[in-house]
């Protein structure tokens, strides 16, 4: 049961990480660091 719980949490955090990374990468206009890079 412990191995099943660990595997489920691993998959959940993996998809959450992909979602957050994709959201930040697809919407760079809202991040202030984009303007710093353009300067």
UniProtKB/Swiss-Prot annotation:
Gene Ontology cellular component terms for the protein in this record: organellar chromatophore thylakoid membrane; photosystem II reaction center; plastid
Keyword field contains Transmembrane: yes
Role of this protein: One of the components of the core complex of photosystem II (PSII), required for its stability and/or assembly. PSII is a light-driven water:plastoquinone oxidoreductase that uses light energy to abstract electrons from H(2)O, generating O(2) and a proton gradient subsequently used for ATP formation. It consists of a core antenna complex that captures photons, and an electron transfer chain that converts photonic excitation into a charge separation.
Regions crossing the membrane: 6-26
Alphabetized HAMAP family for the sequence: PSII_PsbI
Subcellular location: Plastid, Organellar chromatophore thylakoid membrane
Family of the protein in this entry: Belongs to the PsbI family.
Signal peptide per UniProt: none
Subunit architecture: PSII is composed of 1 copy each of membrane proteins PsbA, PsbB, PsbC, PsbD, PsbE, PsbF, PsbH, PsbI, PsbJ, PsbK, PsbL, PsbM, PsbT, PsbX, PsbY, PsbZ, Psb30/Ycf12, at least 3 peripheral proteins of the oxygen-evolving complex and a large number of cofactors. It forms dimeric complexes.
Coiled-coil intervals: none
Topological category with respect to the lipid bilayer: Single-pass membrane protein
Gene: psbI
Protein name as annotated: Photosystem II reaction center protein I
Keywords: Membrane, Organellar chromatophore, Photosynthesis, Photosystem II, Plastid, Reaction center, Thylakoid, Transmembrane, Transmembrane helix
GO annotation terms (biological process): photosynthesis
């Amino acid at each position: 049961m412990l191995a099943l719980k660990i595997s489920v949490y691993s998959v959940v955090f993996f998809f959450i990480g992909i979602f957050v990374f994709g959201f930040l990468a697809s919407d760079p206009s809202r991040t202030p660091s984009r303007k710093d890079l353009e300067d």
